[in-house]
Amino acid sequence: VGCGASGSSGSASSAAKKDYTQILHDARSDEDNEYEMIFTKGEDGKFTAQYGYSAEYEADQLSDEVANMMMPLLGLEDDMYDDFAASVSGMMVRVYGVAIVKPAEGKTQDVVDAMDAYVQSQQKSMEHYLEDQYQIASAARVATVPTGEVVMVCCEDSDTVFENIKKALAA
């Protein structure tokens, strides 16, 4: 009985952990999956990524790129989250960012503030530069969903992508 109980509690906890990378992948367009990698933090504390151009990197290079380029864009500090998956465009001519963040205890507002700051910086950089990209940034959404995650969607068709993510998180 002890083995069965420990086995079932193990599977219950793994069932509770959601695959944020897969949820983002399924919520967005095929084109975004082709061009924009989705990154997260691996068990070993290094950043990993799938999709987009992630296959072009060696593991350490990829982890460094995410740590030095992508995470500062999002404004997420290590102590702010328990888990996350995100995808942002590093191109200055394209507004693109999606993220699912499971905040650390007591850090929900910090995560919301970081996501809001990302969206505001995208709006500001595009306001007098590329009107179509400014419209995308202006339609961005940051919200804490009923399951507790903070979701940021700053991309084309943001309402649909947001609803797809919200539904998948609730499943």
For the regions a protein language model found, what residue spans apply to each?
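Extracytoplasmic/secreted envelope proteins and their assembly/folding machinery
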Residues: 17, 21-24, 98, 108, ...
